[in-house]
């Protein structure tokens, strides 16, 4: 965290450009290493930008609860340190919450990938790029469908 406080001005300006909401994904692979780093990252981001909304999606709340006394591993949603903490595995809850308020900025920590429910939300609207071609605008209406 000390290194983050001493970031050059350029990096601090990047923090200012962040949206007001960041969704942080953490798939716990080892017991405490990855969730420990993600916890410190979220804490540092909160300190850098006071009104930042952090939504932390964690695959193993038991591990998180062991390193932080404020986490209840039995709750699939909770508020902690001003963050919204979600259980990665509660598909219905997460899909409902993130459908109402889609993520603006997503951090996939340690290349964890995205949960299936988030993939569905992000890629639910698709269009076929094969149809888009360099055709003059006045001829587009004449293209057969």
Regions found by a protein language model. Name each.
Residues 19-23:
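Extreme N-terminal starter segment of soluble prokaryotic enzymes
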Residues 2-11:
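Cationic, amphipathic, low-complexity segments that mediate targeting or membrane/lipid association
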Residues 2-3, 18, 99:
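Residue-level detector of alpha-helix boundary/anchor positions
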Residues 25-49, 55-145:
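Active-site and donor-binding regions of nucleotide-sugar-utilizing enzymes
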């Amino acid at each position: 965290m000390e290194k983050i406080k001493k970031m050059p001005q350029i990096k601090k300006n990047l923090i200012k450009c962040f949206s007001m909401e960041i969704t942080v994904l953490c798939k716990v692979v080892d017991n405490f290493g990855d969730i420990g780093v993600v916890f410190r990252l979220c804490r540092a981001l909160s300190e850098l930008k006071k009104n930042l909304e952090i939504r932390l999606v964690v695959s193993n709340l038991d591990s998180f609860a062991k390193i932080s006394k404020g986490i209840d591993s039995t709750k699939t949603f909770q508020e902690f340190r001003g963050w919204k903490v979600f259980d990665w595995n509660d598909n219905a809850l997460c899909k409902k919450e993130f459908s109402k308020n889609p993520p603006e900025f997503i951090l996939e920590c340690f290349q964890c990938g995205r949960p299936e429910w988030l993939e569905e939300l992000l890629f639910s609207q698709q269009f076929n790029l094969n149809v888009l071609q360099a055709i003059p605008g006045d001829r587009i209406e004449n293209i057969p469908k």
